């Protein structure tokens, strides 16, 4: 009976691996566990178009979603007339510095493919808006205007997103201060 007890978990593990093995081997750090619902929705929408063109589907990755959530940085812009603007944003430097915290390799590469924004005042509001976004080709262009997820950047395999409050604020030279909440969703690809 002891032997059967020891062998049973091994057989289950082997069977489970056989049933879930992807067409190509995944890196050891890859896991769908922890991927957020919105990343899954985006990947489903985008993959319909990618697969229709014969391109490999994007995958969701819990580690990427966790990394994006950890990588907010407060940005500051000082205007020539002395006005100081601040806001939150996900930055490439923060992504790179947090890689080991989520178990991703140090040579991971990233590209931001879109912001989803619509003057949303809460997490739920931007979540519902983002779920309904029409993913036209125009939405997914990088800083140089190149199409990314549909016809280029095909070496990027993973998609992730994060929703956060930009926490915009402005301090004028006369001391007047204003702040506002605007929730946005950033969509990134990783390879």
Residue ranges of predicted features:
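Generic ordered-secondary-structure signal
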Residues: 8, 12, 20, 41-46, ...
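Compositionally biased, intrinsically disordered low-complexity regions enriched in proline and serine
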Residues: 9, 16-17, 30-31, 56, ...
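Short, well-ordered surface patches within globular domains
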Residues: 24-102, 157-159
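A well-ordered secondary-structure block
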Residues: 91-191
């Amino acid at each position: 009976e002891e032997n059967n007890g020891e062998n049973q978990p091994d057989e289950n593990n082997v069977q489970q691996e056989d049933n879930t093995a992807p067409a190509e081997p995944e890196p050891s750090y890859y896991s769908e566990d922890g991927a957020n619902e919105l990343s899954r929705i985006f990947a489903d929408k985008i993959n319909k178009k990618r697969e229709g063109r014969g391109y490999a589907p994007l995958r969701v990755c819990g580690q990427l979603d966790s990394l994006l959530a950890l990588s907010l940085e407060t940005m500051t812009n000082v205007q020539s007339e002395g006005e100081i603007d601040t806001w939150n944003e996900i930055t490439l430097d923060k992504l790179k510095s947090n890689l080991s915290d989520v178990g991703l390799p140090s040579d991971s590469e990233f590209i931001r493919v879109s912001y989803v924004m619509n003057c949303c005042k809460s997490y739920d509001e931007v979540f519902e808006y983002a779920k309904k976004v029409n993913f036209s080709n125009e939405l997914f262009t990088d800083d140089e205007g190149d199409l990314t997820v549909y016809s280029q950047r095909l070496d990027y395999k993973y998609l992730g997103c994060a929703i956060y409050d930009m926490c915009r604020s402005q301090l004028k030279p006369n001391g007047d201060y204003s702040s506002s909440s605007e929730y946005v969703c950033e969509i990134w690809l990783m390879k």
